[in-house]
């Protein structure tokens, strides 16, 4: 009887230790993700945007790819009737 109680208490202790360890790993992972998301490095180095393709939204012709121009009526990149290689 004493051995059964001892094994039950030991099993509960091991389960508690295992749960605590997994929670600590989860917290470390959460902290790492938050620091990566909110780091200032991403804000200081903006990336250059690609050109907009046919029927992509634009505000000026420079937003569109080389063979397209921005239509002032609709604000879309449309073909400018040129042929290039």
From Swiss-Prot:
Stretch forming the signal peptide: 1-21
Origin superkingdom: Eukaryota
Keyword Chloroplast on entry: no
Major site of localization recorded for this protein: secreted
Compartments where located: Secreted
Disulfide bonds: 51-65, 58-70, 64-77
An example Gene Ontology molecular-function term: toxin activity
Proregion residues excised on maturation: 22-49
Gene Ontology cellular-component annotations: extracellular region
Keyword vocabulary terms for this entry: Disulfide bond, Ion channel impairing toxin, Knottin, Neurotoxin, Secreted, Signal, Toxin, Voltage-gated sodium channel impairing toxin
Cross-referenced InterPro entries: Huwentoxin-1
Swiss-Prot/TrEMBL domain comment: The presence of a 'disulfide through disulfide knot' structurally defines this protein as a knottin.
Protein name: U5-theraphotoxin-Hhn1a
Source organism: Cyriopagopus hainanus
């Amino acid at each position: 009887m004493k051995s059964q109680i001892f094994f039950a208490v030991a099993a509960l202790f091991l389960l508690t230790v295992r749960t605590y360890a997994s929670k600590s790993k989860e917290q470390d992972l959460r902290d790492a993700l938050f620091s990566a998301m909110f780091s200032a490095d991403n804000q200081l180095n903006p990336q250059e945007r690609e050109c907009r393709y046919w029927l992509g939204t634009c505000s000026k012709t420079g937003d569109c790819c080389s063979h397209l121009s921005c239509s002032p009526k609709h604000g879309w990149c449309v073909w400018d009737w040129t042929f290039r290689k």
